[in-house]
Amino acid sequence: MSVNINYLLLIPEILVLSLGILLFVLALITPRNLQKGIGYLTTIGLLGIFLYMPIAWKHTGMAIEGMYQVDKVAIFFKALSLLAGVFVTAIAPRYMEKIGYYSEFFVFAVFAVLGMMILVSATDFLTLYLGLELMTITFIILAAYRRDSAIGAEAGIKYLILAGVSSAILLYGLSLFYGLTRTLNIVDIAAIVTNNGISPAFVLAMVFVLAGFAFKISAVPFHMWAPDVYQGAPTPVTAFLATGSKAASFAIFFRFFYLAFPGIREHWVGLLATLAALTMVVGNLVAIPQTNLKRMLAYSSIAQAGYILVGFLATDFTGFKAIMFYLSVYLIATIGAFTVVTVYENVTGKEEIRDFAGLSQRSPIMAAVLVVSLLSMAGIPPLAGFAGKFYLFYPIIKNWGWLALLALIMSMVSVYYYLRVVLVVYRDEPEDQTPITLPNSIYFTLLITMAVTIVLGVYPTPLAKIAQQAAMIFMK
C-alpha cells in the first residue's frame, strides 16, 4: 500500500533532522578544543528554521496521509519549539563548557526539538508515540547530563523511571482505544464514538491517556518528578523542559481530546476542571516554602500548567487562542528567568534564593530581567502574563465561575513567593561585589525576553491575532 507524502509540508522537520545529523557528524570528527563553534552553529541553524516558519504558515494540509497533519496549530507550536531551542542553545555554551561533554548537548537538543515537532502534528497513535518517545528519551539523557553530579544522576534516574511508567500508562490507554475502535487514527475515533457511544472500557482508556499526558505537563497528582528533575538537571535543560517540552505536550493534549472526543465533552471536562484546580493550588502553595530558586520555579511551572488547563474549559475557539497566547508569553518569561539562573549558577555555583542577594548591584540587567519575568508569571499588569491570564480566565467566568475565582486567588498567592525573590535581589547586600560580565549571546537573550514580555503586555494584539487565526482553523 502506497502512502502519499507531501514533502513541502515536511520541510521544517527535514531541516531540523539534517541539522541534527550534521551536528552529530561534526561532534565525532571535530577535536574537543575546536568544538565551541558547534553551539553557535546550533543556535544559528535553529534560528534559520524558525525564520522559515512564516513561509510554512502559508502551506497546510495532510503531510503523511492519515498520520501527520500540518495545520496552523501545528505550525504555531513548531515555531514555539524552535524558539525554545534557539534560546536554550544560545544560553548553554558557557554552562556546558564548564560541565564538559560540550557538543553532545547540542545534538540531543536538536533531536528533542524534532521530537516536539513530530508530536504536535501527530494524528495517529504511531506518530504520536514516535514523537513523544523521541522527545522523552532525549530529555532523559539531557536531565542526567551532569554525570559527575550525584543530584544530576538522581534527576536522570527519577526521570527515566517515571517517564517510563507514564509512557507505559499512555501506551496501554492507546492500545485499549485500538482494541475498542480498530483504528489508529485520532479523528476516526470521534466518528466511532458518535455512532456507537462509549463503554466503561472506553472511559478507562480515556483515563489512562489523560494520566499519561498529565505527567508530561506536570499536572497534579502526576507532578512529583518535576521539582527533583528541574533542580538536578543542568539549568539550560530545566529551561527546555519547562518551555518547549511543556508547550508540545499541551499541543498534543488538546489535539487528542478535541479531535477524538468532541461529542462526549461532558464526560471529561469535569475531570479536567478538577485537574486544573488541584494543579493550581498544589503548585502555588508548595512553591511558598521553597528556598532553592530552580525548585521554586519548578512548582511555579506546575501552577502555570493549572492555569493553562483552565483554557480547555472554554466552549469555543477562545480557549485555544488563550492557551496558545499564554504558552507563548510563558515561554518567553520562563526563558528569561532561567537565563539569569544559568548565568548566576555558572559564575557562583549557587542557586539558592538567598544567594541572589544584591544581584541588582552586580548585574542590573540580570536583576531587571528576573524581576520582569517573575512578575509576568504572576500576572502583574502591564506585562504579558497579565494579558495571557485575562485571555485564559475570561471565557470561563460564565460556566466555571468558581474555577476562574480560584485561578485569580492562586495568581495572587504566587505574587508572594515571586516578590520574595525580588526583595532579595534588590534589598539585600551581596556577599561578593564583583560585577558579572555577560557574553553577547546571553545579553541579547536577556534583552529580547524582557522587551517581548513588556511589549506583549502593552500591545498583545499581533500575537493574539496569530493565535486566533490558528485556533479557528483547528476548530474547523
UniProtKB/Swiss-Prot annotation:
EC number per UniProt: 7.1.1.-
InterPro entries hit by this protein: NADH-Q_OxRdtase_suN/2, ND/Mrp_TM
Catalytic activity annotation: a quinone + NADH + 5 H(+)(in) = a quinol + NAD(+) + 4 H(+)(out)
A GO cellular-component term linked to this record: plasma membrane
Membrane topology listed for this record: Multi-pass membrane protein
Subcellular localization: Cell membrane
Keyword Acetylation found: no
Keyword Cell membrane: yes
Tree of life domain: Bacteria
Residues that span the membrane, as ranges: 9-29, 37-57, 73-93, 105-125, 126-146, 160-180, 202-222, 244-264, 268-288, 297-317, 323-343, 365-385, 402-424, 444-464
Main location: membrane
S-S pairs: none
GO process terms (BP): ATP synthesis coupled electron transport
GO molecular function, one term: quinone binding
Keywords: Cell membrane, Membrane, NAD, Quinone, Translocase, Transmembrane, Transmembrane helix, Transport
Enzyme category, top tier: translocase
Similarity remark: Belongs to the complex I subunit 2 family.
NCBIfam families registered for this protein in UniProt: NDH_I_N
Subunit structure: NDH-1 is composed of 14 different subunits. Subunits NuoA, H, J, K, L, M, N constitute the membrane sector of the complex.
Primary role: NDH-1 shuttles electrons from NADH, via FMN and iron-sulfur (Fe-S) centers, to quinones in the respiratory chain. The immediate electron acceptor for the enzyme in this species is believed to be a menaquinone. Couples the redox reaction to proton translocation (for every two electrons transferred, four hydrogen ions are translocated across the cytoplasmic membrane), and thus conserves the redox energy in a proton gradient.
Protein name (database record): NADH-quinone oxidoreductase subunit N
Organism field: Carboxydothermus hydrogenoformans (strain ATCC BAA-161 / DSM 6008 / Z-2901)
Gene name in the database record: nuoN
